[in-house]
Amino acid sequence: MKLLEQIFEIAKKEPDLIVLAEREQKFTYRQLFAAVSHISEQINERNLNQRPILIFGKNDFITLAAMLATNLRGHAYIPVDAHTPFERTEMIKSAAKPAAVLTTVELSADFEALFTDRISLELTDQILTDKLPALDFSKAVSGNDSNYIIYTSGTTGVPKGVEVSHDNLVTFTNWMNNDFMKIENNQILSQALYSFDLSIFSLYPSLTTGGTLISLSRDETTNFKLLFERLNKTVINTWISTPSFVDICLLDPSFTEKEHPQLVQFILCGEELTKKTAEKLLTAFPSANIYNTYGPTEATGAISSVKITKELLTENDRVPIGFAKPGVDLKIMDKEIIIVGDSVAKGYFENPEKTEQAFFTVDGKPAYHTGDAGSISADGMLRYQGRIDFQVKFNGFRIELQDIEANIQNLKEIEKAVVLPKTNDQHKVTALIAYLETEKTFEDRAAERAFTKELKAELSKTIMDYMMPTKFVYLKKFPLNQNGKVDRKALAQKERGDN
């Protein structure tokens, strides 16, 4: 059965069940499919080709409905968050060449010009009062059809689209449902941007089991006061987020089992879980089931998991990333973690060169080069040992350092750029340091800070805010190693000044 049909079966049985709760409004499964039906009709009226559809919006009800409606009409969806910089959105649109663009937010003039032939969606009273519609699932995505395409950081400065099939998503959803979604009337945190693959941890397992998505707005995730207020008046049973987001919430003294007795499960992914964070969370929620999971976007969500216990933390210097889920074979080749099996995505959308570099086959099965160093113990436990290339996780987001470098080097007065991660004793990336080769001279620190401010303003037009370097270091010439290459280790020792 197709995922959409599974969700629709729940809507037929319990149409008034809450599917998603925003800060000010709650929506039912009936209303979800009324909106899906309405949007799918608008898509159908366009007589589109079968290329993907770009959806520009926020983490909200209407954007979720647009994603499902797109799949209902047989299209993959490309989620792009409304706060994505214009130039980056333009690059994604240019690379994807979507059949159409759906927008669920008000647009500024430049975005209106970019999305000239868009389908503008809004939530109307008619949609919310409609009865549960009869839907035709014959054209809905299935099998190896592409379900969604998420654009991630690319080494050349141009984002690349990870193409995930319906079968990939079914495999992931079934695993999540079998292992984690056994809580009755499950209320599941939906914090990750829809354009970030961590979002599928919440979306599809919740929708296919009759759960309720507790959706946090950007205002709430970026304003601690609003965030803590919302959490303290909201019942959540299953928590899904990056470890960094947990770190933020642990700053609130009331984020404890005593104040949140219904919060019984944590599923963490998106970046390395440090021992300090794991220990703090175990102390705050001693009775909860806490899981560390691992998996790149190219392997559909996560492919391994392990329950966090005091014993596990005592026995390991770094928190292990777990045992492989069914259908996944993990291998270590030249110290690199290789993922083999039915979770591996189709490749990078219409980018055969990048696909060939990262995707291959092992014994006839799809495989992916993660770029992560790791080891597997005799009992099958996978351990993460850092990146083997220039890709890092910072605040839960996967970032290609060369993406930032390429965009900086496009700026005036900058000859070369190297971006390096700064880590703490827990191996967690705490900052991104940009080293810039430039002939620019500064009369004083004030002049340097002013130049940095201008540089950041220009850079913010082409990279996401979470990719912005924390500090900028200016050099006349980069040090070189014996091979004539930039000596990154020497650069790391040259960090100076505050910006």
Curated annotation (Swiss-Prot):
Per its record, the protein catalyses: holo-[D-alanyl-carrier protein] + D-alanine + ATP = D-alanyl-[D-alanyl-carrier protein] + AMP + diphosphate
Q: Where in the cell is it found?
A: Cytoplasm
UniProt keyword Ligase present: yes
InterPro entries (alphabetical): AMP-bd_C, AMP-bd_C_sf, AMP-binding_CS, AMP-dep_synth/lig_dom, ANL_N_sf, DltA, DltA-like
Q: Name one GO biological process term.
A: lipoteichoic acid biosynthetic process
Chain positions recorded as ATP binding sites? 152-153, 292-297, 372, 384-387, 485
User: Which top-level group of life is the source organism from?
Assistant: Bacteria
**Can you cite an annotated GO cellular component?**
cytoplasm
Q: What is this protein called?
A: D-alanine--D-alanyl carrier protein ligase
